[in-house]
């Protein structure tokens, strides 16, 4: 039982780790509160996804005029893999004749019967039942730009906490993935790919967790696992996708959109994973980083989401500093970290930790966030919720960083937390910490 629980909850954290993988953070969203079950709700209207934040309309995202658009592929993945939109529009006429479309529809509908139920249960827990905690705890004046290190596949958690965000960035070892195959999959391959996807998203739509095995496997699926996971977040939160492009960073950290010629050139080269013991991707380097534009139905302005496939340990950030330059240019931002394998506790992740301490205006995390060992000397205040007796992962328990968190909870006032949002502690208790400048 203990081994199974550990496998379910271990997240991957964007660097090199030994006891856990180094990719994305597990979302660890407990849709059962702390052990309580919910009935499947009626799908929420778009407004039901709005929790905390300013009532002012979001600032318009700058238009994109360059780069190859994968809008059509994004729309297909949104409908087929993430199960957004009407069932009658799931398989468009462009995917084949009536007989083929009927077969594809049956495959997609079987998948969506499972996924829509899980999305609805999640929505009931976090956008409805636990809505009040986020609305009351998160200030309305925080920046609308959100950076989520170690957050691969977990746009959903950022949408729960910060529904007014106009720009969200996640970073992890997982590469975004190639969306092109969704247009040509036959019913058998589509069924196999969707079945694999339901396994590979792990507990994203239940306990919000994943394992390194699943995250590695995503990179070999015909359906891009990272993109599909993010689109599930949009569907669950009541958003629609408007465009999707891929990009790279230049030496100064500026976004450069991938053109068709770049894709054709990259397709000739073999791609390696960002972690040595992971399966090699079945797609090219051109599909490492993705930008998805989205909005609520009827909303005039697009919002921007970007996922970076990037190793966040010090060695790699020294070799490839473009990401830090890109992030620093955003100025003060709102931050989120959870399920991050305690990598921010380690001395080998000092560069990303220092960036966070220098640029956070307000941060929400579980105990895998920035420990008081580093936050207090940087002039931060940390407010705790729930209870904490030590790290969930045994290999991170009892370290100086972990003990500083135990001491923080011991000296802080007791604040209740009626749900799980990230890792539990060594005793199975949910907990959260707010970090902000004094």
Residues covered by each model-derived region:
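Acidic, Pro/Ser/Gly/Ala-rich intrinsically disordered segments
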Residues: 16, 22-24, 47, 54
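Non-globular targeting/processing and membrane-anchoring segments
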Residues: 29-202, 284, 296-438
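General secretory precursor processing signal
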Residues: 7, 15-16, 86, 115
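Intrinsically disordered, low-complexity, compositionally biased regions/tails
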Residues: 8, 17-19, 27, 37-39, ...
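Sec-dependent signal peptide recognition
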Residues: 1-7
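Soluble extramembrane regions of membrane proteins in the secretory/endomembrane system
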Residues: 288-294
């Amino acid at each position: 039982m203990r081994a199974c629980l550990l496998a379910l909850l271990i997240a991957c954290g964007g660097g090199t780790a030994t006891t856990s993988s180094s990719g994305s953070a597990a979302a660890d969203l407990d849709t059962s509160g702390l052990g309580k079950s919910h009935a499947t709700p009626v799908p929420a209207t778009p407004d039901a996804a709005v929790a905390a934040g300013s009532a002012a309309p979001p600032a318009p995202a700058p238009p994109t005029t360059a780069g190859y658009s994968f809008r059509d592929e994004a729309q297909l993945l949104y409908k087929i893999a993430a199960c957004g939109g009407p069932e009658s529009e799931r398989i468009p006429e462009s995917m084949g004749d009536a007989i083929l479309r009927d077969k594809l529809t049956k495959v997609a509908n079987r998948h969506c019967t499972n996924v829509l139920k899980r999305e609805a249960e999640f929505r009931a827990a976090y956008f409805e039942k636990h809505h009040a905690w986020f609305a009351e705890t998160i200030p309305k004046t925080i920046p609308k730009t959100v950076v989520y290190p170690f957050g691969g596949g977990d746009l959903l958690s950022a949408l729960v906490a910060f529904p007014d965000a106009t720009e969200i960035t996640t970073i992890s070892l997982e590469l975004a993935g190639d969306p092109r195959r969704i247009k040509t999959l036959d019913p058998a391959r589509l069924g196999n790919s969707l079945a694999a996807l339901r396994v590979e998203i792990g507990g994203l739509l239940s306990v919000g967790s994943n394992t390194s095995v699943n995250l590695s496997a995503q990179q070999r699926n015909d359906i891009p696992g990272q993109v599909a996971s993010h689109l599930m977040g949009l569907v669950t939160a009541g958003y629609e996708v408007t465009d999707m492009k891929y990009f790279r960073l230049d030496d100064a950290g500026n976004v450069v959109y991938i053109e068709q010629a770049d894709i054709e050139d990259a397709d000739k080269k073999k791609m390696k994973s960002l972690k040595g013991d992971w399966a090699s991707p079945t797609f090219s380097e051109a599909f490492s980083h993705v930008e998805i534009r989205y909005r609520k139905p009827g909303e005039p302005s697009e919002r921007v989401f970007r996922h970076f496939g990037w190793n966040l340990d010090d060695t790699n950030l020294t070799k490839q500093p473009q990401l830090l330059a890109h992030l620093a240019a955003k100025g003060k931002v709102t931050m989120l970290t959870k399920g991050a394998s305690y990598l921010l506790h380690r001395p080998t992740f000092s560069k990303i930790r220092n960036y966070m301490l220098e640029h956070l205006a307000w941060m929400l995390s579980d105990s895998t966030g920035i420990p008081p060992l580093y936050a207090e000397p940087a002039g931060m205040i940390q407010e705790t919720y729930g209870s904490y007796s030590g790290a969930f992962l045994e290999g991170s328990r009892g370290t100086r960083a972990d003990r500083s968190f135990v001491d923080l909870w011991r000296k802080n006032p007791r604040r209740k937390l009626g749900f799980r949002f990230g890792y539990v502690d060594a005793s199975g208790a949910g907990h959260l910490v707010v970090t902000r400048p004094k």
